[in-house]
């Protein structure tokens, strides 16, 4: 189990990313726009750099919904490998069967 503080930190990052997503997209569009003047593009770069570090989606980490484990998380299910295995063995995941050949 991950510490509660780590789970809360990740939740806070998700909220920050959602809050700044629209503004970040506008600034990035201005930066790559070849028709914009160099001054406008530079101002957009500076404004993007002044945003909080956690506003970037690259800082998000996929975590298991049950345990908060940061590694071995399956995106499709949102569960860590251990919890996914337990859920599959209990039959909680429809269509998921143990491989045998």
Swiss-Prot record:
GO terms for cellular component: cytoplasm; small ribosomal subunit. The keyword Magnesium does not apply. The keyword Ribonucleoprotein applies. One of its GO terms (biological process) is translation. It comes from the Bacteria. Pfam families: Ribosomal_S14. Keywords: Ribonucleoprotein, Ribosomal protein, RNA-binding, rRNA-binding. Signal peptide: none annotated. Gene3D superfamilies: 1.10.287.1480. One of its GO terms (molecular function) is rRNA binding. InterPro entries: Ribosomal_uS14 (IPR001209), Ribosomal_uS14_bac/plastid (IPR023036). Belongs to the universal ribosomal protein uS14 family. Part of the 30S ribosomal subunit. Contacts proteins S3 and S10. Binds 16S rRNA, required for the assembly of 30S particles and may also be responsible for determining the conformation of the 16S rRNA at the A site. This is Small ribosomal subunit protein uS14. It comes from Pseudomonas putida (strain GB-1). The lineage of its organism: Bacteria, Pseudomonadati, Pseudomonadota, Gammaproteobacteria, Pseudomonadales. The gene is rpsN.
């Amino acid at each position: 189990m991950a510490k509660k503080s780590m789970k809360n930190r990740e939740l806070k990052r998700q909220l920050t990313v959602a809050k700044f997503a629209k503004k970040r997209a506008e600034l990035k569009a201005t930066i790559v726009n070849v028709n914009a003047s160099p001054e406008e593009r530079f101002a957009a770069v500076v404004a993007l750099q002044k945003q909080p570090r956690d506003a970037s989606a690259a800082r998000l980490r996929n975590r298991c919904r049950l345990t908060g484990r940061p590694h071995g998380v399956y995106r499709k299910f949102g569960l860590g490998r251990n919890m996914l295995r337990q859920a599959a063995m209990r039959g909680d995941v429809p269509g998921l069967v143990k491989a045998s050949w």
